[in-house]
Amino acid sequence: MPSMTDTTRSLRDCLAPAKLNLFLHITGRRPDGYHALQSVFQLLDWGDRLHFTLRDDGKVSRVTDVPGVPEESDLVVRAASLLKAHAGATLGVDIEIDKRLPMGAGLGGGSSDAATTLLALNRLWRLDLPRTTLQSLAVKLGADVPFFVFGKNAFAEGIGEALQAVELPARWFLVVTPRVHVPTAAIFSEKSLTRDSKPITITDFLAQRGIDAGWPDSFGRNDMQPVVTSKYAEVAKVVEWFYNLTPARMTGSGASVFAAFKSKADAEAAQAKLPAGWNSAVAESMSEHPLFAFAS
């Protein structure tokens, strides 16, 4: 849990957890241009760390430089400003970001930062807004943000905002991120992208229990993976390396590729076999967002 000072003027060390898409099916394209999808989102105990300090002048300020992300377009600033305007909050905030997740990796880093901001400021500004209200704000910031506010592992539909909580077994994951940025919008616009996967139900997923044995290759797929691996040799190389060892899958629109293990030792043993210089992390599954209690 994050630490709050005695004067309740700050919240420190707030985790913005990464997510994995255990599968990702694209079932259609909506009139508004968004793609309809189905997925299961898995939270990880690995992510960026955010620190929030109250300001009395009402200003929202990001005090950490994030290369390539101007302050005014940063999702944490947009989230704080949106929440402030909605609630009529008079206080401001300084936001520090300890960026640990790679960008353009399919791990939800920016979206998770935004959700952690909404949850933390709901507590720090003493707004006491319900989770449903925060989720309605979250969807204005991006398709993945509502999941992180929802705060539980989930079966997702729509553009990712229609969520049902799902219990997943404890797992350790090895996540490998090639040093390439995959632009999500460009992948969604590719003509070769599958957009007609047959819809499933949450019952289908739970009945097959692919996550218990032989997963992740025993249930579904990531419809974006063939497109990304055909365009980015770095991602294809990681997928190929994993398949010589254990089943693996790309998360989101990439570039990260992951495999599941039953123990930390197994995940670290696989990590030790990676080629020198590859960017990787071992992380444990989580069942609930660390700031889940900051909204009702």
Swiss-Prot record:
Gene3D superfamilies from the UniProt entry: 3.30.230.10, GHMP kinase, C-terminal domain
Reaction(s) catalysed (UniProt annotation): 4-CDP-2-C-methyl-D-erythritol + ATP = 4-CDP-2-C-methyl-D-erythritol 2-phosphate + ADP + H(+)
Keywords assigned by UniProt, alphabetized: ATP-binding, Isoprene biosynthesis, Kinase, Nucleotide-binding, Transferase
Annotated binding of ATP, by residue: P102, M103, G104, A105, G106, L107, G108, G109, G110, S111, S112
Active site location: K19, D144
Entry's EC annotation: 2.7.1.148
A GO MF label: ATP binding
InterPro entries: GHMP_kinase_C_dom (IPR013750), GHMP_kinase_C_sf (IPR036554), GHMP_kinase_N_dom (IPR006204), IspE (IPR004424), Ribosomal_Su5_D2-typ_SF (IPR020568), Ribsml_uS5_D2-typ_fold_subgr (IPR014721)
Secreted found in the keyword field: no
Any one GO biological process: terpenoid biosynthetic process
UniProt superkingdom: Bacteria
Pathway annotation from the record: Isoprenoid biosynthesis; isopentenyl diphosphate biosynthesis via DXP pathway; isopentenyl diphosphate from 1-deoxy-D-xylulose 5-phosphate: step 3/6
Leading EC class: transferase
Similarity section: Belongs to the GHMP kinase family. IspE subfamily.
Function, as annotated: Catalyzes the phosphorylation of the position 2 hydroxy group of 4-diphosphocytidyl-2C-methyl-D-erythritol.
Name this polypeptide is given: 4-diphosphocytidyl-2-C-methyl-D-erythritol kinase
Species assigned in the record: Burkholderia mallei (strain ATCC 23344)
UniProt gene name: ispE
